Structure formats: C-alpha cells, structure tokens
Amino acid sequence: MLLNDARQQITDACSHLSDDGLVVGTAGNLSVREGDLVAITPSGLPYQEMRPDLVAVVEYATGKQVEGPLKPASELDLHLTALRATGQMSVVHTHSYAATTVASLEGVSALPAVHYYICMFGGSDVRVADYAIYGSPELAANVAKALEGRTA
C-alpha cells in the first residue's frame, strides 16, 4: 500500500476532527503530500468509518488516482491547488460551525488574528476565499488567491 504513514495520519486526524466536532458526517477533507503523491480522504465516507486502506492516493502533478478503492474527495482540485500555492505538505479543510458561519458572511474578506499561531503560521489575519461552487476550478482558484503569500 502506498503512503502508509500518510494514510494512517489522515485516519487519525479524521477521528480527532470528528470527536472534536470540527466536521459532521462527510463534510470536509484532508490531504498529505509525500513527494509526487498525495493521500486524500475519499468522497462520501463518514470520518468515523475512515481506515488507511480507504484513503485515496493521487498523483501530485495530475490528480490521477493511483490507489484506493474509493474516489478522492470532491475538493481534490482545491487540495492540489493549495499544496502547490503554499508549498506545504498537508491541507485540512473542515466545515466547522465557526468557519462555515464566517464563510457565509457577505462582504467579509478577512478576520483579525485572534491567536498568535495565526501570525506565526498564516499571516496578520485570516483571509476568507470568495464563494464558488464546491469542487469547482473557481473555488480552487479563489482559495489560491486567498493563500497568496501565505503558508496557511
């Protein structure tokens, strides 16, 4: 099985995110890049049912699935775009109540940093990406724009 450690990390994180109420059901997704491959949560699988062997593996350059019985998350393009834009090795995309509420506020383009970790790892504020339909190239582009000059 490819990317055993990354798949286990994703499975463990899914359990924590679900237990902490940061995701509900199948909302949100996670990915971890190792070299030319990316492990990503599969589409439509509740986090409580996640197992390493169910995590999809795709090519970093193309997004083509190379392993896993289930198709990758519908936000695969968003993950690949964010990984490329930031140079980071993982993406955690939750649908927490707070994040969903903020994303729904019209006219809000950024939130002030309320914790020093935001400044250490992200920037002086938290940017809000412009709305676009889930899974669309437009949403991936909007996220990349919000991440310009940032690592998170």
Per-region residue spans from a language model:
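Glycine-rich flexible loops
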Residues: 1-152
